[in-house]
From Swiss-Prot:
Signal sequence coordinates: none
Pathway field: Amino-acid degradation; L-phenylalanine degradation; acetoacetate and fumarate from L-phenylalanine: step 4/6
A Pfam family the protein falls into: HgmA_N
Organism: Drosophila melanogaster
Protein name: Homogentisate 1,2-dioxygenase
């Protein structure tokens, strides 16, 4: 996997050919009467044809057989806990915390990426192209002779344990913990693993993930475009006679059989592509004077809504950094938010709650549900000597923040048996320190 090659950039128009078949891209046009090597030309659209040029997304694929060459789709009976039913549980406004989600049992059958999808929470409706879902994947087997694609939206995948070897129609990429990848709507992919693997998925229905505007930060900072990587063209030259394609369509899974692999794209060009990003390359912005900055300064990617400055979903990280603020309570402040905050932990311990929030687990603080540092964190930070120090060293926490009110599935609230009923206790020992006279 380390030998995989990539194209650098975000939102760029790329061109790529499998090096085994040079000159496989048509010259000067997209759809010649006969394509080089007698390939089929197929356009994959990620936006309306008439979308503004700055937002128009599409890629031309040159493949051995068109994607339409398959048998009819039938309901797929795997992935029992992959759901888009937001009404199966009553609303729960409490602070929620999950202990690390289970990996597949060592003595059980192999579970691949699709079979190991479990939905935790979400909102909206993929049929109206509005909303999101948050899933956990837990797998110990590879997707042999099969592929998956999402008709409903984009997947942002956050590995927490185990390296994902992902084959897409565009080529191959390796995604390890502390890296992420995005598979846009409709792009077919397969996940191979060589050890038990677990991670988080943010699925958005509305639009695609983009880089946040930088405003007064300037032209550089946060996640820089040059650090995003898109795989180079590669096709599977095996003669596969029994292949299945799994589709997520209107919130449900379907499967179709065909007598050839979908990974037969010899060349492609366009700007609608899968990509990966190494979170260690994020350029952190922080206060160098006083006060705790809002977490929006840690935004890696965003899926914007129609309301200016308000996201359907933001992907935010809390990376290792220097903390130097003077006369300041440095950890995250106590908060009631008009947004929903789902947090996960990839590595180490989270700075505001070192106890109880473990790697592979999660928290959900719903709209206007109060949250903030636990007693240990508050007392420690209130009395700490304020010297420059490294924080979050050896850790990587992240947040999926959304303007939508998220409903928790039955699997998330009951079946997984990971919900920590004692979470609320971390705030119960907070004292009333009010003094009539100022400090």
């Amino acid at each position: 996997m380390s030998e995989y090659k990539y194209l650098s950039g975000f939102g760029s128009h790329f061109s790529s050919e499998d090096e085994r078949y040079p000159n496989s891209l048509p010259v000067g046009q997209n759809s010649p009467q006969v394509c080089p090597y007698k390939l089929y030309a197929e356009q994959l659209s990620g936006s309306a044809f008439t979308a503004p040029r700055t937002e128009n997304m599409r890629t031309w694929l040159y493949r051995k057989l068109p994607s339409a060459a398959h048998l009819p789709f039938q309901p797929f009976k795997g992935a029992e806990y992959f759901s888009q039913n937001w009404d199966e549980q009553p609303p729960n406004p409490n602070q929620l915390r999950w202990k690390p989600f289970d990996l597949p049992p060592k003595d059980g059958k192999n579970v691949n990426f699709v079979e190991g999808l479990h939905t935790v929470c979400g909102a909206g409706d993929p049929r109206s192209r509005h909303g999101l879902a948050i899933h956990i994947y837990s797998c110990n087997g590879s997707m042999d002779n099969s592929a998956f694609y999402n008709s409903d939206g984009d997947f942002l995948i956050v590995p927490q344990q185990g390296v994902l070897d992902i084959t897409t129609e565009f080529g191959r990429m390796s995604v390890a913990p502390n890296e992420i990848c995005v598979i846009p709507q409709g792009i077919r992919f397969a996940v191979n693993v060589d050890s038990p693997s677990r991670g988080y998925i943010l699925e958005v229905y509305d639009d695609h993930f983009v880089l946040p505007d930088l405003g007064p930060i300037g032209a550089n900072g946060l996640a820089n475009p040059r650090d995003f990587e898109t795989p180079v063209a590669w096709f599977d030259d095996r003669d596969v006679k029994d292949f299945q394609v799994i589709s997520k369509f209107q919130g449900r899974l379907f499967v179709a059989k065909q007598n050839h692999t979908v990974f037969d794209v010899v060349a492609w060009h366009g700007n609608y592509v899968p990509f990966k990003y190494d979170l260690s390359k994020f350029m952190v912005i922080n206060s160098v004077s006083f006060d705790h900055c809002d977490p929006s300064i840690f935004t890696v990617l965003t899926c914007p809504s129609l309301r200016a400055g308000t996201a359907i979903a933001d992907f935010v990280i809390f990376p290792p950094r220097w903390s130097v603020q003077e006369h300041t309570f440095r950890p995250p402040y106590y908060h009631r938010n008009c947004m929903s905050e789902f947090m996960g932990l990839i590595l180490g311990k989270y700075e505001a709650k070192e106890d109880g929030f473990a790697a592979g687990g999660a928290t959900l603080h719903s709209m206007m549900t109060p949250h903030g540092p636990d007693v240990k964190c508050f007392e420690g930070a209130s009395n700490a000597k304020l010297v420059p120090e490294r924080v979050a060293e050896g850790t990587q926490a992240f947040m999926f923040e959304s303007s939508l009110s998220l409903a928790v599935t039955k699997w998330g609230e009951e079946t997984c048996q990971k919900l920590d009923a004692a979470y609320y206790e971390c705030w119960q020992a907070l004292k009333n320190n009010f003094q009539i006279t100022k400090n």
